[in-house]
C-alpha cells in the first residue's frame, strides 16, 4: 500500500515552502534578513499606512509571526510603529533605511527568482506561482 500521506497537500506544500524559504534565506543571510522579513518589508512598502491586521491579511502572516518580525525589523531601524489617533491597532511603516535596503536587495531577490525559474523552467515556475495564488484563496 503506498504511503497516502506522501500525497498530502499540506505536507508537500509545507515541505516546498520550507525548501524555497531556505533557498531565499541563503541569499539574504549576508544582510541579516530572512525571506519572511523581506516579504514583510515589501508589504509595508506596498501597503503604506496599513494596520498590522491589514498587513497580516494581505501577506498571509499569522499575527504572532508578523508581530515578532515587525519587532525585529523595528530594532534594526527598518520599520517604525505608531498607533492610530482613532481606534485600536498598530500601524507599521517602512523607514528610509528600510526602503534603501529593499532597493539594495532587489537585484539579489531578482537573481533568486531567476535561479528558481531556471531550475524549474519558466513554464513550471509560472504554473507553480498560479497554483500557489489559487491555493492562497482556498
Where are each of the predicted segments found?
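Alpha-helical initiation/capping and key positions within long helical/coiled-coil segments
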Residues: 8, 12, 58, 65, ...
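Charged, amphipathic alpha-helical coiled-coil/dimerization segments
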Residues: 21, 71-130
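C-terminal ligand-sensing/allosteric alpha-helical core of TetR-family HTH transcriptional regulators
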Residues: 5-23, 97, 108, 131-135
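A short beta-strand-loop micro-motif that forms or neighbors metal/cofactor-
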Residues: 49, 124-138
Amino acid at each position: 500500500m503506498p504511503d497516502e500521506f506522501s500525497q498530502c497537500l499540506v505536507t508537500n506544500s509545507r515541505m516546498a515552502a520550507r525548501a524555497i524559504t531556505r533557498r531565499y534565506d541563503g541569499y539574504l543571510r549576508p544582510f541579516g534578513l530572512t525571506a519572511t522579513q523581506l516579504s514583510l518589508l515589501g508589504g509595508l512598502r506596498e501597503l503604506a499606512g496599513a494596520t498590522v491586521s491589514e498587513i497580516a491579511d494581505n501577506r498571509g502572516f499569522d499575527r504572532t509571526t508578523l508581530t515578532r518580525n515587525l519587532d525585529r525589523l523595528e530594532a534594526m531601524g527598518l520599520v517604525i510603529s505608531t498607533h492610530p489617533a482613532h481606534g485600536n491597532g498598530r500601524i507599521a511603516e517602512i523607514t528610509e533605511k528600510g526602503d534603501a535596503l529593499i532597493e539594495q536587495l532587489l537585484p539579489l531577490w531578482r537573481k533568486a527568482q531567476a535561479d528558481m525559474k531556471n531550475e524549474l523552467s519558466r513554464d513550471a515556475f509560472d504554473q507553480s506561482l498560479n497554483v500557489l495564488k489559487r491555493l492562497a484563496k482556498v
